[in-house]
Amino acid sequence: MNNLNGLSFHRLIVPFSKVSDMIDFQCDVFPDLDAATDEQLKQYSAVVYQREIDTNGKSLEIIKKYHSLGIKVIFDIDDIWTLPKSHYLSRLYEIHNIPAQTVEILKNVDLVITTTKHLASKIKKYNKNVEVIPNCLDHEDEQWKSNKTKSDKIRFGYIAGIFHKEDISILEMPIRKVLRHDINAQFVLGGYNDNADYNYYEKVMSGGTLTDKYQRVYSLPVHDYGKSYNETDVSLIPLQSNSFTECKSEIKLLEAGLHGNPAIVSDVLPYNILPKETAIFLNNSDINGWYKAIRNLSKDESMRKEYAESLQKYIEKHYNINKWTKVRKQILKSVLA
């Protein structure tokens, strides 16, 4: 693992740290697994890769090497491997032939772990040995313990990484409509960095003019970014619907739920696998629906509380990381047997 990002943090570092806390497992992180000698590798029963093994066409060779040493190869993947042309990595995927390489990996590893049943159905075409372990957040981690700052406005937050221009564009017209009316709402952008993408996000969230109806929250490290939710009261979760996004995980609803935020969310996969009472689900093209949801939640405290409690209870029951750590343990034991 050469760098720590949100993906590796949620899919490798946190869950395998939990597994490593169990007496019958030891999990180590290698900054550069390719540099490990055979003798170093032989002390391990399995290696776990996330999303890719090698981008230069050597993945199958690497897998065969592990197998020759008696080491099982586990592959964790949380996104579909074919990207739409609009995706910022599509050209890079094309140059390195990542889709074909990923299929080759899926066919040859001992176990695939993924995030949703929908994505698992795509993977099973190439490897029947696939298990679904959803993204979970560590409830004991300080960044997921709600500690809201005070505000005289109801704060509607969009907290996301870069490359979500198509998603946030869903909010542009509803926000402009809200700002034309006397509604006690403020729009909060979390994760801000001074670049073209976030400046576009800011234009959407502010309605094009920086006033006290808008707040900027700067980017935080991956182990702290959840604290951005303390500057929000309601989560806005827009997502375009296509073959790529429908294979993503529902993690934004998990983040909202643990921070006690009600959510207004696109009625698309992966979010609409949750019950309808957990959030306000809307069609992306329903400008008036998004406007009304923002207006109504800004005025109705009991409505905010009802949606927040419903989401939080569902998340705590179905996405409890300690529960899923036990499941992960049994899956690992099975593949290593």
PLM feature segments, named:
Residues 48, 74, 108-116:
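A short beta-strand/loop micro-motif in the catalytic core of glycosyltransferases
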Residues 3-18, 138-144, 149-230:
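Conserved catalytic-core segment of nucleotide-activated headgroup transferases in glycan assembly
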Residues 285, 302-333:
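A charged, aromatic-enriched C-terminal amphipathic alpha-helix characteristic of glycosyltransferases
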Residues 1-54:
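N-terminal pre-catalytic "stem/leader" segment of glycosyltransferase-like enzymes
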Residues 54, 166, 221-228, 233-255, ...:
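Nucleotide-sugar-dependent
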Residues 276-287, 296-302:
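Conserved acidic donor-binding segment of nucleotide-sugar-dependent glycosyltransferases
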Residues 118, 136:
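Carbohydrate-associated surface elements
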Residues 64-68, 92-111:
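Membrane-proximal helix-turn-helix segments that form the acceptor-binding/catalytic region
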